[in-house]
Amino acid sequence: MYKRQVTWQKGDVVYDGNASAWGTDCFWAPEVYERDGRYYLFFSANWRHNPNGDLETFRIGVAVADSPSGPFSDLYDRPVFDPGYPVIDANVLWDDDGRVYLYYSRCCYKHPVESELSVWARDKGLFDEIEESWVYGVEMKPDFSGVIGEPVVLLTPPQSASDPQTGWESRSVTAGEVNRRWTEGSYAFKENGTYYMMYSANFYGGQHYAV
């Protein structure tokens, strides 16, 4: 919390999972939005439902509070939806026509992608495969109880070595850091009728992470 953006004071925990919550751990990437006087917290967490024993079961949930400082409570006892793969980094856009869109990042986990870079990495003896995270978008129901239609892929790491974006978006691989390429942390906004999306690439724990 801050006062006049100069003096800061530590706030309390605003959301805490419990034994009956759908999310178990690794609560991740919160974003809070005010709508009609209430505050909605979108976040990622590992889903309790894990019949295959996966290491990552991230899904996106939403909690609600009457104050931006919480406490927040789950709006539903389940994730917003289940795309069939782990997802993080929820971002929400309300369009001028009232429709609501959810953007998220598919995790790299169990998502190997064959590309010119993966062939290069294999030839160099760096990595056998390259896993990637991609940004998707999908329309969301106004009450956040689910989605409308199927998610659409909006952003991926460059697949061609000749793509001018490949250099900076692939440094985690070319530097031998890790066998993954990220497109994550998306933020969508609209300005003068045009839609823009910011995002982050490269290993979030490495020196090449960038926007």
Locations of regions flagged by a protein language model:
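Carbohydrate-active catalytic/glycan-binding domains of CAZyme proteins
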Residues: 3-211
